[in-house]
Regions:
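Histidine/acidic-residue-rich, glycine-tolerant segments that coordinate divalent metal ions
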Residues: 163-244
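Metal-dependent amide/peptide-bond hydrolase catalytic core
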Residues: 11-16, 26, 206-208, 222-379
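Short glycine/proline-enriched loop/turn "hinge" motifs that connect secondary-structure elements
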Residues: 119-120, 160-161, 214-220, 317, ...
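Short, conserved micro-motifs enriched in small and acidic residues
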Residues: 34, 134-147, 175, 240, ...
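Active-site metal-coordination/substrate-binding segment of hydrolases
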Residues: 100-170, 193
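N-terminal helical capping/dimerization or prosegment-like subdomains
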Residues: 11-116, 344, 348, 361
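Active-site-proximal alpha-helical scaffold in enzymes
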Residues: 143-159, 178-186, 244-256
């Protein structure tokens, strides 16, 4: 039996059944096809595509999303593409409202690199629908954002529900650390004004049964550690034990900032006192989610998480620093590796830092710690 679900918001009745129908029909018939086309565009963030301007993929992604936005039947909607010399483009939209407040909605259009490890039949630039999941690079991070934002606004306007003055931005450098965003925001400052709230559609949710709010995210320090020991590769049977191993020295340097046995960051300046309110919230979230805190990740059989306490796992991923090696150069593949003592080891470091840590001073400290007095005079 069909039931008409209703609610009241600011004195206006809401037909939830009608709203749900609009969302589902729009998502299935309009958003999924357009989002699938967006997935096909290899719009790598500038950090991963130094020739992004010449390649034109970011431009294509921005144009694609902007074109869809312009077609939406939203009263008062304006859509424009903002450009600054040498910077990635940004979509700026406005929807005037009936409430004398401003809300800023944020999303981004650039993507992470392709990576490897896709399951058979799946790939980064080929959208594949399997059940209720759409696979492909950038669909969830963060291509869906503009689609979701404007569909939500349509739902409000369809039922005459008052809303604030809405300003929307879709940037294209987020996966590189948003280096272009500050200049765009400065250029748009007078038009954006002072938002009463910022909605950032680039996060996650614990489950589908609750409304989740992201209170803070960790920042990231990204850099490369390059250890050089020789000007040419030499036979390890001849030089091994004489020329120091660049990999060993890299490990030694990393031990200055991280305990290799536990993974704990050993630089005090990268830690903060966690507010008691956040600890309490982590405990509540752990009770709600249970093992889903870690079981949502693709662990191999027999591999265990870093802690058996679910609350501690939540705090680990939100309020504590962590180091990961996300790339490496100077190493041949295992199949191509011979008996050569390599000239260098180059590692890309990704260091997550919690809210409250000064990123500039932390970056300087990490660089100094890793590079001062390298073992055996390595370069």
């Amino acid at each position: 039996m069909n039931r008409c679900l209703t609610a009241v918001f600011m004195g206006v009745g809401i037909d939830l059944t009608k709203m749900k129908t609009l969302i589902e029909e729009t998502w299935e018939n309009d958003i999924i096809p357009s989002l699938s086309e967006y997935i096909c565009i290899p719009a790598l963030s500038p950090a991963f595509d130094p020739n992004w301007q010449e390649n034109g993929h970011i431009e294509n992604a921005i144009q694609h999303i902007a074109a869809w936005c312009k077609m939406q039947e939203i009263e008062g909607l304006t859509v424009e593409i903002c450009r600054l010399e040498g910077k990635t483009p940004l979509i700026y939209m406005e929807v005037p409202g009936q409430i004398d407040e401003t809300v800023l909605l944020y999303q981004h259009a650039d993507k992470q690199p392709e990576f490897v490890g896709w399951h058979e039949g799946l790939g980064p630039w080929t959208p594949v629908r399997r059940g209720d999941k759409l696979y492909g690079r950038g669909g969830a991070d963060d291509g869906y954002g503009a689609y979701a934002s404007l569909t939500a606004i349509r739902c409000l306007q369809q039922q005459g529900i008052p809303h604030a003055n809405l300003k929307l931005i879709v940037e294209a450098s987020e996966e590189s650390g948003s280096p272009d965003l500050p200049e765009h925001l400065e250029a748009l400052a007078d038009r954006i004004g002072t938002p009463a709230m910022v909605v950032c559609l680039d996060s996650g949710a614990g489950d589908w049964d609750h409304l989740w709010l992201t209170t803070s995210l960790r920042g990231v320090i990204v850099g490369t550690l390059n250890v050089e020991v020789s000007s040419a590769g030499v036979h390890s049977g001849d030089a091994g034990g004489i020329i120091p191993s660049s990999f060993r020295i890299a490990r030694n340097l990393l031990d200055r900032i991280s305990d290799s046995a536990t993974g704990k960051i050993t630089v005090p300046e990268l830690w903060v006192d966690i507010p008691q309110s956040r600890i309490d919230q982590a405990n509540i979230a752990a009770q709600i989610l249970g093992d889903e805190v870690y079981s949502k990740f693709p662990f191999l059989e027999g591999v265990s998480p870093n802690d058996s306490d679910l609350s501690e796992l939540i705090l680990n991923r939100t309020w504590r620093p962590a180091l990961e090696i996300t790339g490496a150069d100077g190493m041949p593949t295992c199949a191509a590796g011979g008996n050569v003592l390599r000239t260098n080891t180059k590692l890309k470091l990704s260091i997550r830092i919690p809210a409250g840590v000064d990123s500039e001073s932390a970056t300087e400290l990490i660089a100094k710690t890793l590079t001062e007095n390298p073992p055996q005079g390595a370069h």
